[in-house]
A protein has these predicted regions:
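Conserved class I S-adenosyl-L-methionine
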Residues: 1-48, 149-171
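Class I SAM-dependent methyltransferase SAM/SAH-binding core
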Residues: 54, 60-109
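Class I S-adenosylmethionine-dependent transferase superfamily signal
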Residues: 67, 138, 186
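A conserved beta-strand element that flanks and buttresses the S-adenosyl-L-methionine
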Residues: 121
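A short glycine-rich, Lys/Arg-flanked "PGG" loop and its adjoining helix->strand segment in the class I
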Residues: 133-144
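Short alpha-helix
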Residues: 175-191
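A C-terminal cap/extension of S-adenosyl-L-methionine-dependent methyltransferases
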Residues: 197-248
């Protein structure tokens, strides 16, 4: 497996991150993106039944067990961190893990043959990679008209960027959340690319609700967010984005 210096740093970071059971402080904020993850799951469920699926940068398998319930024909999880893959197997358990192909590989230079998968999805992985290399590989391993479904952080909110500067040890030094111009990489390889933004007011007021599923406050804020995100000005204040498309 060929590795760049950036790849080696990412391996070290994620091996250390997942080599213990500590919960990251930042995890408490992710409830502000509950509607995004719900939409992400819905997109996968609508597209994966009886399909060959790739979890791109599967990490510790946060999505794999869930996607198994959506009846894919075959599901593969690939990650550059052996520590993460082993932890994923432990978390998911032996009975379910035997239904998943776990592959240790470099997402910027995959060993799969072209056209291996009908759907490729990922959560918070692309901003750890070189966009041009990763998206070219995703396109290569997809069948014609194969689908992509990704959620990624944005690097356009000044308050979030300030927090990132204050907490450099919480992320790898090579991370680069998406900027507006970065979406051109998607459009170079995929058609019908759609972006849906999340996490503005739901993040600002996250102290005012506990469980987003049962919160009228969260529902109000998330609906208001979607109205605001129709205007380009407010999109830069989003925390994250859902990206869908199909192979050219």
């Amino acid at each position: 497996m060929q590795l760049s210096e950036e790849n080696k740093r990412e391996i070290k970071f994620h091996d250390e991150l997942h080599g213990n059971d500590k919960v990251r402080f930042e995890n408490r904020f992710y409830k502000a993106l509950a509607n995004m993850f719900s939409d992400f799951d819905s997109q996968i469920e609508q597209n994966c039944k009886n399909k060959r699926i790739l979890d791109f940068g599967c990490g510790i398998g946060n999505n794999l067990e869930k996607v198994l319930k959506f009846s894919p024909k075959e599901i593969t999880g690939v990650d550059i961190s052996k520590v993460s893959l082993e932890k994923a197997k432990r978390i998911i358990g032996d009975d379910k893990s035997k239904n998943i192909n776990f592959i240790h590989d470099n997402c910027e230079k995959l060993s799969f043959v072209s056209g291996s998968f009908e759907v490729v999805y990922g959560s918070g992985i692309l901003h750890h990679l070189k966009y041009d290399l990763a998206l070219k590989e995703i396109s290569r391993v997809l069948t014609n008209n194969g689908k992509i479904i990704f959620v990624e952080p944005l690097g356009t909110n000044p308050v979030i960027n300030f927090y990132r500067r204050l907490t450099p040890k919480s992320r790898s030094i090579d991370e680069h959340p998406f900027l507006e111009n970065d979406f051109s990489y998607f459009r170079a390889h995929f058609k019908n690319v759609k972006l849906k933004y999340y996490g503005f007011l739901t993040l600002i007021f996250f102290f005012f609700y506990k469980d987003p599923k049962n919160s009228l406050i969260f529902n109000f804020l998330s609906n208001l967010d979607q109205k605001l995100f129709k205007y380009k000005f407010f999109q830069k204040f989003a925390w994250s984005v859902l990206i869908t498309g199909a192979k050219n």
